[in-house]
Design a protein with these regions (language model features):
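Surface-exposed loop/interface segments of Gram-negative outer-membrane beta-barrel transport/assembly proteins
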Residues: 2-81, 97-210
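Active-site and adjacent substrate-binding regions of carbohydrate-active enzymes
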Residues: 93
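Short, intrinsically disordered, charge-balanced linker/junction segments flanking boundaries
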Residues: 213-220
């Protein structure tokens, strides 16, 4: 959504927004490398046409991650970016501009590793293992510019600007996980069904205020 409007001869406003929603299912990254070391014997599929997890005694298929309900990595995210400005010219040669930009980002990542899964899991994880990670972040920047530009005696250009900028960022995350689920179909939705739990959380914040002053002069 975009808007630019001249509301008075001395005032102009604008607004821009962008919203993105994503639902992403990610695959594993080590299937090909595991297939290079797999013994090229045995039956890759069962008589029912399903992937044969143990295709030779003691040898497990590099395709086991693709067995139904054995590996899940789903991320849902929402991103919002909004910016606006107001530009004022109260007197000739003097301009005041104020801009605000902000972003809001949320994501939920759900992962599940079944007993037959080959994909790397966290070092603390048992088998099966499931986790849900939530990330929230937001930031905004507010800038103000007071500018004066004039021409004296047709040949002398004189200008000056006073600039301020305020920025703040904040992010937080939480992760809950458990191991030992008995039903693969539960995926990452029933963490309380595991026999051992693991929890992590984090928070970070930064903020900054900046000032600048500039003078310009040019002849002809």
């Amino acid at each position: 959504l975009n808007l630019d409007q001249q509301i008075f001869s001395w005032a102009k406003v604008g607004f821009t927004s962008n919203l993105v929603y994503r639902d992403l299912n990610s695959g594993v990254k080590n299937t090909f490398t595991k297939s290079l070391s797999a013994i090229p014997l045995g039956d890759a599929y069962t008589e029912e046409g399903e992937i044969n997890h143990e295709y030779i005694t003691g040898q497990y298929s590099p395709m086991s991650d693709f067995i139904e309900n054995q590996y899940v990595d789903n991320t849902r995210s929402t991103y919002l970016n909004v910016s606006g400005y107001v530009e004022l010219t109260p007197v000739k040669d003097l301009t005041f501009t104020s801009r605000v930009n902000g972003t809001l980002n949320h994501s939920r990542r759900g992962q599940y590793w079944g007993e037959k899964c080959n994909a790397n899991r966290p070092s603390y994880a048992g088998s099966p293992h499931a986790s849900i990670t939530n990330n929230n972040a937001w930031n905004y920047t507010w800038e103000n510019i007071l500018a004066y530009n004039t021409t004296i005696a047709k040949d002398h250009n004189l200008g000056g600007s006073l600039i301020t900028s305020w920025n703040k960022n904040q992010s937080e995350s939480s992760m809950a996980a458990s191991s030992g689920q008995m039903v693969d179909q539960w995926s990452f939705w029933r963490l309380t069904s595991g026999t051992s739990q693991h929890v992590e959380s984090d928070f970070a914040q930064t903020q900054k205020m900046s000032f600048a002053f500039r003078l310009n002069y040019s002849y002809k």
